[in-house]
Curated annotation (Swiss-Prot):
Residues that bear Phosphoserine: S31, S33
Modified residues (N6-succinyllysine): K4, K35
Official protein name in the record: Cytochrome c oxidase subunit 4 isoform 1, mitochondrial
Organism: Trachypithecus cristatus (Silvered leaf-monkey)
Alphabetical list of CDD domains matching this protein: Cyt_c_Oxidase_IV
Function: Component of the cytochrome c oxidase, the last enzyme in the mitochondrial electron transport chain which drives oxidative phosphorylation. The respiratory chain contains 3 multisubunit complexes succinate dehydrogenase (complex II, CII), ubiquinol-cytochrome c oxidoreductase (cytochrome b-c1 complex, complex III, CIII) and cytochrome c oxidase (complex IV, CIV), that cooperate to transfer electrons derived from NADH and succinate to molecular oxygen, creating an electrochemical gradient over the inner membrane that drives transmembrane transport and the ATP synthase.
InterPro entries: Cyt_c_oxidase_su4, Cyt_c_oxidase_su4_fam, Cyt_c_oxidase_su4_sf
Subunit annotation: Component of the cytochrome c oxidase (complex IV, CIV), a multisubunit enzyme composed of 14 subunits. The complex is composed of a catalytic core of 3 subunits MT-CO1, MT-CO2 and MT-CO3, encoded in the mitochondrial DNA, and 11 supernumerary subunits COX4I, COX5A, COX5B, COX6A, COX6B, COX6C, COX7A, COX7B, COX7C, COX8 and NDUFA4, which are encoded in the nuclear genome.
Length: 99
């Protein structure tokens, strides 16, 4: 088949605030540079630069807590849709009263 089926019996990665440590890492297939960084991680963390620490974090997690807590713009869609339907209903009521 064309579409790959998910096996839900295996652990999956998910970013959730109430479950901060997922069962598996975000990046499943590491590149050569990422593998080298994972080997360097086993040594002292004081020898790692800040960029390397951030890269290690991004291998394990997709988003930070700040990114997870960031608000979305979905409310604009909800308000716009509700306003559209209220206006459409008002037009129908005015049309019914006139004719």
């Amino acid at each position: 088949s064309v579409v790959k089926r998910e096996d839900f019996s295996l652990p999956a990665y998910v970013d959730r605030r109430d479950y901060p440590l997922p069962d598996v890492a975000h990046v499943k297939h590491l590149s050569a540079s990422q593998k080298a960084l994972k080997e360097k991680e086993k040594a002292s963390w004081s020898s790692l630069s800040m960029d390397e620490k951030v890269e290690l974090y991004r291998i394990k997690f997709k988003e930070t807590f700040a990114e997870m807590n960031r608000g979305s713009n979905e409310w604009k869609t909800v308000v716009g849709t509700a306003t559209f339907f209220i206006g459409f209903t008002a037009l129908i009521i005015m049309w019914q009263k006139r004719y």
